[in-house]
């Protein structure tokens, strides 16, 4: 029975993203999860400048050079009778929009915290996004094999700064050179750490209880006393893990380990299998769509141009919300009202792509995009659905783009159009000139756009400053007032890459004045796709 198979496939899926501050060890963590899922045989020493093996999930050249994840990688692998869909999000702050969109496509998230630094600014921002969607969070305190802050102090900080209740599942014994392992409070078992096995999977020694003379001797009396004292405090104060509170994003299970040392990474996967939700109902404008519905539905949350320089292609990443994809499936592209037959959908392992025979709710599939698919598009078996919650944010920095070679303006327009479609930047075309203005969240984004224009479109460009402070999407229900506004504000109006009218404000004061002068006009700082 199809319904039974659908329910079984949905129950075995876990789709989650990894979020963290840059350098907390997110890419290393991603790679070790792949190692445990047997998706890769040996872990490359991630980001090691000496090593020629760069992290598996950082596949774009610029990412390899800079050592930061700029685009979202999607990876699928099996683990203990489950299918894991792992989304690695950009760790750099300039790419918050991409991260936000990724978080609309997952059912839960893994928060990686650097044990030496604690809660950092980027983590706070990402948690705000998770809170908007009540995303369940599992926390991993990383780098236990280095000198870190006191674990109790870290828990306190997570609770106070991120406003989420911590439930330690494991508790660390020692740190840095003296790191001996973790004690699992639920199982009453001690997992012993052995250094030097970071890139392979080795059997870990597990003992019942935690008080063992040889372990005590190994870590020394001081570290042992500190461990016992903090463990006692944790056991006294620890509230039990309440799955309901966890699913509401109010409580987070906390695990300790070292991704580089490949220790306790399997605890993370087990936690997702045991506690994290399977694919749930997804909100559309019309109604909530349940994962176990038989009709197919899915939405595009990301577009990536030139994933394979050999193919000069664009791939649309789609999260399946209900039903089943199979080769040759006919689906309706709701925004343009057209039926399409998809026979060449892709599955991913960070740049390695394979054609796909079937996929189920929770899975992320790639569709070849010939310029017709946009971020936020919905595909269904025929029902007119519009999935919600995938916004464009107003950029905070602006530059005018100039060509070194004026004959390449066609390539520049094509490049900027495609890069804006995939969300790498936003493009604005003022009504009073032929200028092309790019908007970004941070400086690095400009570098990425210039780099990709050069590498992928063979266009050499330079940036010039421009007196734009911020941008707002403008809308008005009263056509007469709107036309009057368009005449008066003509010099500051532009059209974005999607053809929407925007107001380019030279200063905050100017924007405030315009809002006061034109109370019937809506000045929006986000636009849904």
UniProtKB/Swiss-Prot annotation:
Chief location bin: cytoplasm
Gene Ontology biological process terms, A to Z: regulation of translational termination
Sequence positions that bind GTP: 20-27, 88-92, 142-145
One cellular component term from this protein's GO annotations in UniProt: cytosol
Compartment annotation: Cytoplasm
Domain tr-type G: 11-280
Keyword line: Cytoplasm, GTP-binding, Nucleotide-binding, Protein biosynthesis
Domain of life, per lineage: Bacteria
InterPro entries registered for this protein in UniProt: EF-G-like_DII, EFG_III/V, G_TR_CS, P-loop_NTPase, PrfC, RF3_C, RF3_dom_3_sf, RF3_GTP-bd
CDD domains membership: RF3, RF3_II, RF3_III
MF-aspect GO terms: GTP binding; GTPase activity; guanosine tetraphosphate binding; translation release factor activity, codon nonspecific; translation release factor activity, codon specific
Job description of the protein: Increases the formation of ribosomal termination complexes and stimulates activities of RF-1 and RF-2. It binds guanine nucleotides and has strong preference for UGA stop codons. It may interact directly with the ribosome. The stimulation of RF-1 and RF-2 is significantly reduced by GTP and GDP, but not by GMP.
UniProt cross-references to HAMAP family, sorted A to Z: Rel_fac_3
Similarity field: Belongs to the TRAFAC class translation factor GTPase superfamily. Classic translation factor GTPase family. PrfC subfamily.
Protein name per the record: Peptide chain release factor 3
Organism encoding this protein: Acinetobacter baylyi (strain ATCC 33305 / BD413 / ADP1)
Gene that encodes it: prfC
């Amino acid at each position: 029975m199809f319904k039974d198979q659908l329910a079984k496939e949905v129950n075995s899926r876990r789709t989650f993203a990894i979020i963290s501050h840059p350098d907390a060890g997110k890419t290393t963590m991603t790679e070790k999860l792949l190692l445990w899922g047997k998706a890769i045989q040996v872990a490359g020493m991630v980001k090691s400048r000496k090593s020629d093996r760069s992290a598996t999930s950082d596949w774009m050249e610029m990412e390899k050079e800079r050592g930061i994840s700029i685009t979202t990688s999607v990876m699928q692998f099996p683990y203990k009778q489950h299918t894991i869909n792992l989304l690695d999000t950009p760790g750099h702050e300039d790419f918050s929009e991409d991260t936000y969109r990724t978080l609309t496509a997952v059912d839960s998230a893994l928060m990686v915290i650097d044990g030496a630094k604690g809660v950092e600014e980027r983590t706070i921002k990402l948690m705000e996004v998770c809170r908007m969607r009540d995303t369940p969070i599992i926390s991993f305190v990383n780098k236990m094999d280095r000198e870190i802050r006191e674990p109790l102090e870290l828990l306190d900080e997570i609770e106070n700064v991120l406003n989420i209740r911590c439930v330690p599942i494991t508790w660390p014994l020692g740190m840095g050179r003296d790191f001996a392992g973790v004690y699992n409070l639920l199982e009453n078992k001690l997992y012993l750490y052995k250094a030097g096995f970071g890139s392979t999977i080795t059997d870990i020694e597990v003992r019942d209880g935690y008080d063992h003379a040889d372990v005590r001797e190994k870590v020394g009396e001081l570290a042992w006393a500190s461990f016992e004292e903090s463990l006692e405090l944790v056991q006294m104060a620890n509230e039990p893990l309440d799955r309901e509170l966890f699913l509401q994003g109010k409580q987070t299970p906390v695990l300790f380990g070292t991704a580089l040392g490949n220790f306790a990474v399997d605890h993370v996967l087990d936690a997702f299998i045991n506690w994290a939700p399977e694919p749930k109902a997804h909100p559309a404008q019309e109604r909530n769509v349940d994962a176990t519905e038989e009709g197919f539905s899915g939405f595009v949350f990301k577009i990536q141009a030139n994933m394979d320089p050999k193919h000069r292609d664009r791939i649309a990443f789609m999260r399946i919300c209900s039903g089943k994809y199979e080769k040759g499936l006919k689906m309706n592209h709701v925004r343009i009202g057209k039926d399409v037959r998809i026979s060449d959908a892709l599955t991913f392992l960070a740049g390695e792509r394979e054609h796909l025979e079937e996929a189920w709710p929770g899975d992320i599939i790639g569709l070849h995009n010939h310029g017709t698919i946009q971020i936020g598009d919905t595909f269904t078996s025929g029902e007119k659905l519009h999935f919600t919650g995938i916004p464009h944010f107003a950029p905070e920095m602006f530059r005018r783009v100039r060509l070194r070679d004026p004959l390449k303006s066609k390539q520049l327009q094509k490049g900027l159009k495609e890069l804006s479609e995939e969300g790498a930047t936003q493009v604005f075309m003022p009504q009073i000139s032929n200028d092309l203005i790019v908007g970004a969240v941070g400086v690095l984004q400009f570098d990425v756009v210039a780099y990709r224009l050069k590498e992928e479109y063979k266009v050499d460009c330079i940036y010039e400053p421009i007196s734009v402070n911020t941008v707002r999407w403008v809308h008005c229900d009263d056509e007469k007032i709107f036309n009057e506004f368009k005449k008066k504000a003509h010099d500051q109006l532009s059209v974005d890459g999607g053809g929407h009218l925007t107001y380019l404000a030279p200063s905050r004061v100017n924007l405030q004045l315009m809002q006061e002068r034109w109370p019937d006009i809506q000045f929006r700082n986000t636009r849904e796709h």
